[in-house]
Regions:
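Bacterial N-terminal signal peptides
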Residues: 7-15
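N-terminal catalytic cores of secreted or lumenal carbohydrate-active enzymes
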Residues: 26-174
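Structural preference for beta-strand elements that scaffold enzyme active sites
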Residues: 37-42, 72-80, 139-145, 195-201, ...
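Well-ordered, non-membrane alpha-helical segments in soluble/globular domains
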Residues: 52-65, 97-131, 162-186, 210-219, ...
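Aromatic-lined carbohydrate-recognition surfaces of secreted/lumenal glycan-active proteins
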Residues: 138-153, 163-180, 197-207, 218-239, ...
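Extracellular glycoside hydrolase catalytic/binding regions
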Residues: 179, 218, 224-268, 301-302
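Substrate-binding cleft of secreted/luminal carbohydrate-active enzymes
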Residues: 249-263, 267-361
């Protein structure tokens, strides 16, 4: 997530027209079968991360317990992603001096499926919630990050006895295909009952080094039955070109939360209008600065996102992604500060209501 630099009203659900799936008359993208309604970003894979996505951390994103003790389904999509390994190497351009090699790509693919963490923890949590409220209407979806083969890299490693050179687009594409195959192989070997692998997320948030390879990479994963996801940051190179780049699903990052000086009142409506014009979905963003104890307290900005998305018609009709910093949904839930707990309840109820639009309990 590049740092720089919701209340329901009945609104016509076709205000936004996003072309990622065929829809029946009267459907909105939020209710369209095969779409992820609410996808939470779960950063994991670098040693610098404090969150391990254990059972309790995952449960806060799987289900919400209301004031009456009743459970409700929360997020229906889980995006596991990482930008760097925390040891000086990066999975995308610009984050570290050195790019990750094949060995780091392998470590990343494997870490999302270890026992008791990430996908395995989600599987356990969903089992527990199912035992109380039954099966969700929509099987929970997993999206896994796809590292960027960074141009100029010579030390990535070998495939089929050949040293790959990332000045060569064919070698970059082959590395991506290998990683896709590896993730699919590991995911299938785990035999999850509650999770489906929906597709892969292109970790480069700008198109600068991507234009010459993403068509072929996307075609390959689609040939295997998976979707290609992208979440470019606001103003990035190519951030409105997702259809031309052949991504299947694209969310626009507003980046409103991250400015040191709060943007004016027309900022978020402008982002919403851009997303509408380009047929993109939208992302909600907040991090540890939504905690009341943070000296740079910004919880009001989370409210601004939801207000803007409600006013433009996105809140009850459009799939959303959620950038939550390290593990902010759980942090708000377990905080000793009532103001944080209230913010968690308010936020969780918005997600629950959106899931209820999709037919969930």
């Amino acid at each position: 997530m590049k740092k720089i630099l919701l209340i329901f009203l009945i609104i016509p659900v076709l205000i936004f027209s996003c072309g990622t799936s065929d829809r029946r008359p009267g459907d909105s993208p939020l209710t369209t079968e095969g779409n992820i309604g609410d996808m939470v970003l779960m950063y994991y894979g670098g040693v610098h991360r404090k969150t391990t996505w254990n059972h309790d951390q995952c449960m806060s994103s799987v289900a919400y317990e209301d004031a009456h003790g009743k459970l409700h389904w929360m997020f229906d999509g889980f995006l596991f992603l990482e930008f760097k390994n925390g040891k000086g190497r990066a999975y995308a351009s610009y984050y570290e001096p050195l790019p990750c090699r094949k060995v780091e790509w392998e470590e990343l693919a494997q870490c999302y499926f270890v026992d008791g963490r990430a996908c395995s923890a989600l599987e356990e949590c969903i089992d527990e919630v199912k035992a109380q409220i039954g099966e969700p209407k929509h099987k929970r979806q997993v999206v896994v990050t796809l590292p960027e083969p960074i141009p100029g890299q010579k030390d990535w490693g070998q495939l089929n006895g050949k040293d790959l050179d990332f000045d060569n687009d064919e070698d970059r594409i082959e590395a991506c295909k290998w990683y896709i195959d590896e993730v699919i192989r590991i995911f299938k070997s785990r035999n999850y009952k509650n999770l489906e692998l929906a597709g892969f997320y292109w970790v480069a948030e700008e198109a600068t080094h991507s234009r010459t390879i993403v068509h072929q990479v996307g075609d390959y994963m689609r040939s295997l039955g998976y979707k290609f996801y992208w979440i470019p940051y606001w103003g990035s190179d190519g951030h409105g070109e997702w259809k031309e780049l052949k991504f299947d699903v694209a969310y626009q990052q507003p980046n409103y939360f991250f400015y040191q000086q709060k943007p004016d009142s027309v900022y978020l409506p402008k982002v919403c209008e851009f997303a509408k014009e380009r047929g993109m979905y939208l992302e909600v963003e907040f991090d540890e600065r939504a905690l009341r104890s943070n000296p740079d307290y910004r919880a009001d900005r989370l409210h601004d996102y939801m207000d803007a998305f409600q006013k433009c018609g996105a809140l009850d009709s459009l799939p959303l992604a959620y950038y939550i910093g390290d593990c902010m949904v759980n942090d708000l839930k377990v905080s000793s500060c009532k103001e944080d707990n209230d913010l968690y309840d308010w936020f969780a109820n918005i997600v629950v209501k959106r899931q209820q639009i999709r037919g969930e309990k």
